[in-house]
Every structure is written in C-alpha cells, then in structure tokens.
Amino acid sequence: MYKLIIHGGISLNGSVITAGSKNSSLPILFASILANGPITLTNTPHLSDVSTTLRLLMDMGAEFILESDNSLFINGSKLTNLVAQYNLVKTMRASILALGPMLAKYGKAKISLPGGCAIGPRPVNLHLEALENLGATIKVKNGYIYATAKELIGTKIHFKQISVTATENIIMAATLATGITTIYNAAQEPEIVDLVKCLIKMGAIISGAGTSIIIIQGVDELSGVTYSVCPDRIEAGTYLVATAITGGKITIKNVHYQSMHAILEKLLETGADIKTNKNSIILDMKGKRPRAVNIKTSTYPNFPTDMQAQFTALNAIADGYSTITETIFENRFMHIPELSRMGANLVLKGNTVVCKGVKYLTGMPLIATDLRASASLVLAGLVATGTTTIERVYHLDRGYETIEEKLKLLGAQIERVQD
C-alpha cells in the first residue's frame, strides 16, 4: 500500500497536460464488445479503473495491447465468457456498462452487481427496467444480474431520473436493436457525446447526444475504428482548483474548456483571472486568497458532483462564508471529517455543508475514502502548513494519472512512498 506525503504552503505554477477522460474511456472500452473488429483508442488514461476494465474484458475473451504513449488496441469482438465476475467488478461501478453491449451482441449476460466508491447508493434499477423495456428478461439472484434477450426491440425509454451510466448502457444496447429507440430525460454529459461520436464512427445511427432526447436507429453490425478519447474535464478542474487554492498560476493543456463552463464560472467567482484558448486554460490567482463561493451540484451542464469535494477544500481556506449542497449522491461528504481535523470550519446539515473559511489548515495524517474525496485531501495538503500524509491513495489512482508527478511539475513538494 502506498501513501502520499505532502509538504504544504507552496504556490503552484507551471503547466500540465490533461489526460484522456476516465468517464469517457470506460464506456468506450465496453463499446468494443459491440464491434466486429478491433478498436484503437488514443489518449487513453493510465488509471486503475481502465486496468480493471481491461482485465474484465480479457477475462471475457477480449485481447488488448496498452502502449506507453497512451494508445490502446483492443479486440472485444469475440467474447468466449459472458460472465463478469465479482472479484473483477467489486471495485468499479462502471462494470454495469458491460450489460447492454453483451445483451445486444450475444443475447445474454451474467454480471455481478457493481462496486466502486462508497458514496451512497447508485441503484441499477434504471438500467434493468430500460433493458426490460427493450425486450430483455432479467433476474437478480445471489448478487448477480442474469439477463437474456432473443432480440432487443427499439422502444421509447423514459428515465425517471437522469443517470449517466444508464443513458450510456441503453445507447449501446440500442445500437444493435431492431428499430428505433428514443431515450427521454437522457443525461447530457460531454462523455456521453464522446461515446456517441465513437459509436457513430463505428457505424451506429444516433442523434441528439448532448440533449435530453437521444434517438438511436438500430443497425446490423458495428465496425472497429480508431478513436481519440476526449480530455478529462474533472482532472483539469482539479488542477485549476489546486492552483487557485495555493495562489498560483497554471496553464492546462489538452482541454475542452467549452465543457467546463460551470467550473470556470465558480473559479472566476473566487477571484481568479482566467483565459481560454482553443485547447488550453490559463488561470492566475496572483497570490490572492480565494473568495468563498456557494456550490450546488446538479446534472450537466450545471456544476458537477465530481468537483464538489475539491471546491469544499477551496472554501475551507477561502475568505467568507459558503454553502456546498450535494444533490446527486448521498453520503458524498466523507472528506468533511478529515478537513475538519486539519482546522476547517465545516458544519454538515443534511445534504449541505456550511463553511466559514479559515486562514490556515494544518497538515496531519489523513485517510482517503473515495476518489474525489481523496483529491480534496491532496488539495488541502498542498495549502496546509506542515506535512500531510494521505493513506489509501489507490482511490486516487482510479481517476488521476500520476497525480503526484503532475503536481511536482507545478512545484509541489509531494512524494509517493510505500508503507
């Protein structure tokens, strides 16, 4: 097991290159099941969730080669094992995304109920009900989903609530269904748009991605392609907040700023100067203490839940009072006790944190609990006086590619050591 050791109080300055999107890579990897040939992905991030997905697909019969230049060759066209075992999916909720493609391509699937971050329930009923509407027969028994379908038939799907992974699962299943599928109340995230772009390149007929209504015309087969994964807007946002919290200046390269409007708007409210170019963002805090900002998470294009914890760390040392309200997931405040131990003035009231900014945080031993909470502890450690150690950094590795190395490029004193 590894831990991070951070000597805080240093202003971050420099530039970093954003990796490919975790939340785009995973569904595209599962989409390889649909293809009749190999897929080559470029800009693939080296993350533990990507590695877990590849191990899962390999266990099913897929073949892959992951290059050091972040390109990935994967052939998932001829699976021999239609079972996603618990030992491979227990750490990653995205494993449910194998269900739609397997049903569409092979007519059956057995998938363990997924694991992942312990940030409250994320029920899979939306996936299962929608697939049943397409014609699948589904049973849940002994922790596994058993699904069969002689044929998937296009229909109208009305999601009761917005779900990114359910939207992705049904899009993929519908690409090989007979007839037209229309998804209402679909998620609109950029990562869904990226998945759809890849599927269209494979031969799918899809319209409406990025809106609340997505229409899929089923086709007979999909082909292998070469595709570049979009940049990770959450990773980019995390480094922007890290720079703002330490009063520095950063250039983020390989980024689509158009997908980050809600994040950039809040950073402007903190007092940061921001300039955007075609594929880069420049943020300059000019040594200032950030101003507190109110946050309320919601579905895209509003403020993303995956940036809530990072802005909580920023508000902890910001000038003024703020509220942070979480509307997407229950129990996504497990970073609050650890930040409070560092000296943050945070009061949790239901799904809202009330924060009075303090001038200083104090470094100390911390324990990471989930992916984004881990990131908030790193940011707090960067601005704290003294030394901070963070245990269980495997949570970070699920969504951040070599985070300590990128922070070192910005001047941070941070190292990864083995216990």
UniProtKB/Swiss-Prot annotation:
The reactions it catalyses are: phosphoenolpyruvate + UDP-N-acetyl-alpha-D-glucosamine = UDP-N-acetyl-3-O-(1-carboxyvinyl)-alpha-D-glucosamine + phosphate
Q: What EC number(s) is this enzyme filed under?
A: 2.5.1.7
- Give me any GO biological process, just one: cell division
Which residues of this UniProt protein bind UDP-N-acetyl-alpha-D-glucosamine?
A: 93, 306, 328
Q: Give GO MF terms, alphabetically.
A: UDP-N-acetylglucosamine 1-carboxyvinyltransferase activity
Gene3D superfamilies found in the cross-reference section: Enolpyruvate transferase domain
**Which key words are in the record?**
Cell cycle, Cell division, Cell shape, Cell wall biogenesis/degradation, Cytoplasm, Peptidoglycan synthesis, Pyruvate, Transferase
Binding sites annotated in the UniProt record for phosphoenolpyruvate: 22-23
Pathway, per record: Cell wall biogenesis; peptidoglycan biosynthesis
Q: Where is the active site?
A: 117 (proton donor)
Subcellular localization, as worded in the UniProt entry: Cytoplasm
* 2-(S-cysteinyl)pyruvic acid O-phosphothioketal: residues carrying this PTM: 117
Q: What class of enzyme is it?
A: transferase
Q: What is its main location?
A: cytoplasm
User: Which family does the record claim for this protein?
Assistant: Belongs to the EPSP synthase family. MurA subfamily.
| Biological role stated in the UniProt entry | Cell wall formation. Adds enolpyruvyl to UDP-N-acetylglucosamine.
Protein name stated in the entry: UDP-N-acetylglucosamine 1-carboxyvinyltransferase
UniProt organism field: Vesicomyosocius okutanii subsp. Calyptogena okutanii (strain HA)
